[in-house]
Amino acid sequence: MGQTITTPLSLTLDHWRDVQRIASNQSVDVKKRRWVTFCSAEWPTFNVGWPQDGTFNKDIITQVKIKVFSPGPHGHPDQVPYIVTWEAIAYDPPPWAKPFVHPQLSVSPSAPSAFSHEVSGPPTRSSLYPALTPTKSPSPKTQVLSDDGGPLIDLLSDDPPPYRGPENQPPAGRPTTTMQEMPRLPLKVPQEPSPMASRLRGRREHPAADSTTSQAFPLRTGGNGQLQYWPFSSADLYNWKNNNPSFSEDPGKLTALIESVLITHQPTWDDCQQLLGTLLTGEEKQRVLLEARKAVRGNDGRPTQLPNEINDAFPLERPDWDYTTPAGRNHLVLYRQLLLAGLQHAGRSPTNLAKVKGITQGPNESPSAFLERLKEAYRRYTPYDPEDPGQETNVSMSFIWQSAPDIGRKLERLEDLKSKTLGDLVREAERIFNKRETPEEREERIRRETEEKEERRRAENEQREKERDRRRHREMSKLLATVVSGQRQDRQGGERRRPQLDKDQCAYCKEKGHWAKDCPKKPRGPRGPRPQTSLLTLDD
């Protein structure tokens, strides 16, 4: 007999009870059929290195988890319980899985990860202020001298070549300018580059005496003291515009994109205008700017109507802010905050509760995905925030009433429904959704119900036939009884008792003075036999 090959997938199937116990500890429910489908058919298509037989490699599991938890239409909420359970097995393996779990290798600092591992929770809103990071003084470097005694440029050094002035043309694709032409705000470059941070602004920090300020500048100081600047590349703008819906179609998604650009790239006033002009139409841009100016607050913290304060905080013309000073940086930070507020307010449509009620759960849509669409409708068509605890009751009722019919009926029958939170309802809806029958099970149920219906119809037909025969037999019996009764009455009618006679009256001629035996009118002779009466039988 040949030996069987043990794979992570077959190992989990052999210990399925332990897998279900681990899933229960994670407050999720998993099914074996979907477990096999996701592992062997779905996750290999994510192109992150997931094999069809499964793996316990934590890095690959993390990449799959990032794909599953992706927001919007690119996510896979129905696969969340399965990848969470798989991750739990990899990070806390049971005894049968320990020999197959890969040890966690230390990651080299030169290979930063594009994403953070913790993605299960909702992303927190980042601040628009540049983060302050301490810097370390680098070790002294040896210089390589050229033939004329001057230092050669190290192409792998921390700094790009210095800006030589207007007499030299900048390299193609990387336009440069001087500080006098375009002042810039210091930018903090994250240790792990974001996929969106493709602007070549330099990714290393300069040493400085003050360790409490950000040292990653979009305007880099070269060897001759001049600053260098890299604006948005045309590829960035093209990708952002073509890979995202328009502001009118999905304002939430485009607002999230612009917010991430404001955080990761920290653009200047000119960059913001270029970004808005590329991603928004003229009418959309005007609406955003108008809402942003409405959000300007005065010294008392309330929205102001003073034109000078509005123009100072959110100018429509290019300001003369000096980004090398704290005042200039504060102006730019406030401008970004107001711009983000304008995007959020301009993205809200007029209040239309009918649009919210029109959001219903699809036949194969998971409750988590349906809840996200419902919350997005609340944000877009109502002035209410679905994340506000005061609106949780309204969102919960909409979730129950607009869920799929089978899920909604079971949610309405829950005990102590008033005390259930929205999270409790979603977990219960997920449990009901995961216990739904598969298409094969549905076909089998329909076939079984059809056979039972045919059997009942056949039994009813047989019962009706028996009842019809029984009724026909009763009618024939009644008819026979009627015929027999009529014949008996005829016979009794011929033999009816004669009327009462007097003592001297003849019974034959009814005359008085003699009896019937002496009646002269009565014929004399032998008496013949009486006629026989024929009876009708059932055979006749």
Swiss-Prot record:
SMART domains: ZnF_C2HC. Residues 134-144 have a biased composition (Polar residues). GO terms for biological process: viral budding via host ESCRT complex. Residues 145-155 have a biased composition (Low complexity). The modification Phosphoserine is found at residue 194. Residues 159-173 have a biased composition (Pro residues). A motif (LYPX(n)L motif) lies at residues 128-132. Signal peptide: none annotated. RNA-binding phosphoprotein p12 is phosphorylated on serine residues. It comes from the Viruses. Residues 437-468, 488-521 have a biased composition (Basic and acidic residues). The keyword NADP does not apply. InterPro entries: G_retro_matrix, G_retro_matrix_sf, Gag_p12, Gag_P30, Retrov_capsid_N, Retroviral_Gag-Pol_poly, Retrovr_matrix, Znf_CCHC. Keywords: Capsid protein, Coiled coil, Host cell membrane, Host endosome, Host membrane, Host-virus interaction, Lipoprotein, Membrane, Metal-binding, Myristate, Phosphoprotein, RNA-binding, Viral budding, Viral budding via the host ESCRT complexes, Viral matrix protein, Viral nucleoprotein, Viral release from host cell, Virion, Zinc, Zinc-finger. One of its GO terms (molecular function) is RNA binding. Gene3D superfamilies: Gamma-retroviral matrix domain (1.10.150.180), Human Immunodeficiency Virus Type 1 Capsid Protein (1.10.375.10), Zinc finger, CCHC-type (4.10.60.10). GO terms for cellular component: host cell late endosome membrane; host cell plasma membrane; host multivesicular body; membrane; viral nucleocapsid. A motif (PTAP/PSAP motif) lies at residues 109-112. Disulfide bonds: none annotated. Residues 107-222, 437-540 are annotated as: Disordered. The keyword Membrane applies. Residues 440-481 form a coiled coil. A zinc finger (CCHC-type) spans 504-521. A motif (PPXY motif) lies at residues 160-163. PANTHER family: GAG_P30 DOMAIN-CONTAINING PROTEIN. This is Gag polyprotein. It comes from Hortulanus murine leukemia virus. The lineage of its organism: Viruses, Riboviria, Pararnavirae, Artverviricota, Revtraviricetes.
